[in-house]
Design a protein with these regions (language model features):
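The feature encodes the CheY-like receiver
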Residues: 23, 65, 89, 93
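Active-site beta3 strand of CheY-like receiver
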Residues: 53-59, 64
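Two-component/phosphorelay signaling modules centered on CheY-like receiver
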Residues: 20-38
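AAA+ ATPase active-site-proximal loops
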Residues: 139-162
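Acidic catalytic/metal-coordinating carboxylates
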Residues: 42, 68-71
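Short amphipathic alpha-helix used as the core "switch/output" element in two-component signaling
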Residues: 48, 70-82, 99
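Short hydrophobic/Thr-rich beta-strand motif most characteristic of the beta2 strand and flanking loop
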Residues: 34-43, 49
Length: 162
């Protein structure tokens, strides 16, 4: 499984919220910045879309009707471990923020949010994606140019040191 590339290209974003006006607001805000947005209203549709497409990030509501956005986080990450997930909620608390992070969310935004908060979250994800790519490229360079060197010694003192 490889990490999607980051070339300054638009970010593919999944929006999961049971409120239509929130989905529409996020889609308008993000699409105005050139990003590709798929918006769904429930847990099952989110899982279905994530199985069909590659998303770089997702905005996930904490409460999705009778289901929990917290439960959706590990499901999305199991299929796309590189996906960055931002939890959005009208029921913000320290406990839910901690639980969201424990389950794999990268950010947490309370409602009502501003377009600036949303775009800042996207910028942070873009920066992290760029850094992850640089690290992966450096690891590949290191493996190619400096393969692992194995030392062996019959000296008991050297064997303990290794």
């Amino acid at each position: 499984m490889t990490t999607p590339t980051s070339t300054g290209a638009p970010v593919n974003i999944l929006v999961v919220d049971d409120e239509g006006n929130i989905r529409k607001t996020l889609a308008i805000c993000l699409e105005a910045e050139g990003h590709h947005v798929t918006a769904v209203g429930n847990f099952q549709d989110a899982v279905a879309e994530a199985s069909r497409r590659t998303f770089h990030m997702a905005f996930v509501d904490l409460r999705l009707g009778v289901e929990s956005g917290l439960d959706l986080i590990p499901v999305l990450l199991s299929g796309s471990p590189w996906m960055k997930i931002v939890v959005i909620t009208a029921y913000a608390s320290v406990d839910t923020a901690v639980e969201a992070m424990r389950r794999g969310a990268t950010d947490y935004i309370p409602k009502p949010f501003t377009p600036a908060q949303v775009l800042l979250a996207v910028r942070k994800v873009e920066e992290v994606r760029t850094l992850e790519q640089k690290v992966a490229a450096l690891r590949e360079d290191l493996e190619r140019t400096a393969p692992e060197v194995r030392f062996s010694s019959e000296s008991p003192g050297m064997q303990r040191a290794m």
